[in-house]
Amino acid sequence: MENISNKPLSAIISEVADRYWQRINDVFPELANELTKEQGEELYRIMGLSDFIADQLCRHPQWILSLFNGELNNLSRSEFDKDLHGLLSECQSEDEANRVLRCYRNKQMVRLAWRDFLGYASLENSLLDLSALAEALIISARDWLYIQACKQYGTPMDSEGNPQPLIILGMGKLGGRELNFSSDIDLIFTFPEHGETQGGRRAIENQQFFIRMGQRLVNMLHQVTVDGFVYRVDMRLRPYGESGPLVVSFSGLEDYYQEQGRDWERYAMVKARALGPWTAFSDELHSMLRPFVYRRYIDFSAIESLRKMKQLITQEVRRRQLTDNIKLGAGGIREVEFVVQSFQLIRGGREPSLRQQSLFAAIDTLYQLGQLEYLAVDELKQSYLLLRRVENLLQGIGDQQTQTLPDSGLNWYRLCHCMGMASEAELRTHIESAMSKIHRHFIETVGGRTQDEGADLWTQQLWIAYEDDDAQTLIKEQMIDDPELWPQLKSWRETVANRSIGPRGRDTLDKLMPWLLREFTNLPTPSDALNSVSKVIDQILTRTTYLELLYENPGARQQLVSLCCASPWIAAQLAKFPMLLDELIDPTQLYDTTSLDDYGSELRQYLLRVPEEDMEQQMEALRQFKLSQQLKIAAADVTGVLPVSQVSDHLTLLSEAIIEQVVMQAWQQVTARHGVPAYLEEGVTGFAVIGYGKAGGIELGYGSDLDLVFLHSFSREKYPDQGETDGDRPIEVGHFYLKLAQRILHLFSTRTTSGELYEVDMRLRPSGASGLLVSEIEYFGEYQREEAWTWEHQALVRARFMFGSNGLSSRFSELRSEVLQLARDGSDLAKAVRDMRTKMRDHLLKVKTGHFDLKQSAGGIADIEFIAQYLVLANANQHNELSFWSDNIRIFTGLGELGILAHADVESLIQAYLFLRDESHRQTLQQKPGELPLDLVAEHANRVMDIYQRILVD
């Protein structure tokens, strides 16, 4: 490592150093007299190189002398643990402990950054130092909190009376002792055995003890105070992610990974390491996890898993438009990790020496085992070291988590100074060379695709043709009978020529279009395909990465053409949201719709790619997940892979997964500010989301909005002394739930680059638009019994519990059943339902003569729904089971089984309902209004009208 303490500073760095020098002399006037000339020059230099160091020293000028008096040169990692345990042992409160941890962290980070910037330590040692500091801070905080928690709850014991510890798995670079300067820390909390606490006022289960302790530990590390934070903590790698318990037992971990562990979790577990002093429990935990991570056989399936993970990262880079990213870009830090870990996962089951968390150690072992040649090892290591050094310096400038090369001249000068480079151009050349070498080895190991230029295609000649006769001759030679193809292509090409694309984009377009034209000319009417696909290409002309994606992936091109021709709605989605093109790369995945039970877990995994604290990116990720899953459903729908009868099931279950995440994100934001309502038990929100309409009836379509009602479980009569939240800014519980509801609606409705998440309609809540945004559940029941109109009871037939605790779910079901089972006069009910249907038809039916509105015309979907609602309200008092289902199909089936509806009528209504809903989906996918020629639906409509007349009119 080059020592740069005597290298002259550039003018732009000196200008920054001057400002900090003045500032520090203002707060420490006698400093100049305390330092030698060499020390003064070194201090001046380091303040010009790092804003973080300079800012911390201006706040804590007393650190300067202690750093010069040996701390910069003499560093023993074992001191971290000893110092922290000593300092924390004197703390009497959590506030004191927070202050100690943050001040110690900041001083040591200044010390380590100083050594790094001036070349006093090699990169390997810097990473070891940073990892040791993080481990000491985490473990000392854990140990201090364990003592406090034992005083409060008693000591957790196993069945034989042995104390149980909290074991913390450090994941990622922390586990590998390769932590960068400003990094999140990924942790998993676990404990050996279930049992109860002993010695407290009352016994609680071990898991409850560790969950409470774990929550305090995360806050102690993560929370931002006046002294800053210790580390940003990410707990989402634990089993079941955010929806899983914060802490699980060893047996819980083992069961999860054996039964549900995914490939990406195997990859993550390669670097997992039990933090703190090694114990028998550490051995037990690692032995238990080993069979999941390392298979007994040589496991080449790991290659495909890593390839898919890399594909996801590449998509993320495109979607977030990350340029100059030395971690995630092609040839970045992550690709080195993939190369090494692919060998570890493939051969680690047979080669115990590969089972190690450190990348540096693993890559040396691969050379010793003959798995990598010396040149590959040398290139990978040197390139990796360069990128990690740049990453560390980038983050040390402002203590910010970034892997993106600077967009300011100042930070380039700082990087060049520390890296011993004369200019940005020289450093960029070294970085690009390193990334090129890494990417080459990545492709050789994990695989990739190549493609010919396509110069021999006849469509190449068509794309560059200028004379009409030449183009028409080419088309005739191929026996293509489509007079619109050339005029349309020529016109579109002229439009494109006037667009500002840039040389790289234009070159890629010129390579792509012959291949697309070949796809078009294999179809009966190529001009139709060109018309549809060109609208997508128009939207990505200035997004060269997407043009390259289509050029490099034949499968993506084929799917683009196929889907755009099959559905204008899909074409419009692809044009509006180009990031969806990533979904076309792998046709097997595109048409493999997520199973109905897996939308929640898939979404949790998807959100792991986004920093937990970055709410803007979290909102964007939710929208992108919805769009990509919706595309998969539509693709499977139009190609017949997914039966039409299941489309609504998938769209509805997708919405449920998103609702859960939106509520939990809103919950985290509101509780971070105000705390949790004091009346709640641990891990419960006391909040429920009720779906009405299509959401309640499990009948969502493409582009459907959500009819929702929000409820909460708080009651002032039941909890008279717990009417506020428990945070630093407590508010009344009713106000808390109002803020939560407002935040949820904000997360749904905010329009990002990926659009709106869902349009949410809250007008079905008690008292409609004039009512409270969120109601207490008992008031909801009272309103439904005493104030609601008949049409509100009709709506309640379609209501379904979509999010909340089991207790709230049970209570809602009871209240709903009570209301639906109220005794009603049959003729009065029929008149009220009939009048509402007439009013709705008069207001909403606008269809031209000879056409049939699928929903509002007589004999349409609305008539069928009103028949179901009337029959439930009229008969549930005598047949309680009718109040169970919210979807029309099962309601009609139940009515038939009870003999209330004739089986022929049941069959007619179900067939008509499915037919009309299917046609509604079809019309949406074709971007046509929800109507058909009357003769196509007359048979179904006439049967429905006949049944409607017999039941509601005669």
UniProtKB/Swiss-Prot annotation:
Residues 454-954 are annotated as: Adenylyl transferase. Gene3D superfamilies: 1.20.120.1510, Beta Polymerase, domain 2, Glutamine synthase adenylyltransferase GlnE, Nucleotidyltransferases domain 2. It catalyses: [glutamine synthetase]-O(4)-(5'-adenylyl)-L-tyrosine + phosphate = [glutamine synthetase]-L-tyrosine + ADP; [glutamine synthetase]-L-tyrosine + ATP = [glutamine synthetase]-O(4)-(5'-adenylyl)-L-tyrosine + diphosphate. One of its GO terms (biological process) is regulation of glutamine family amino acid metabolic process. Disulfide bonds: none annotated. The keyword Nucleotidyltransferase applies. Belongs to the GlnE family. This is Bifunctional glutamine synthetase adenylyltransferase/adenylyl-removing enzyme.
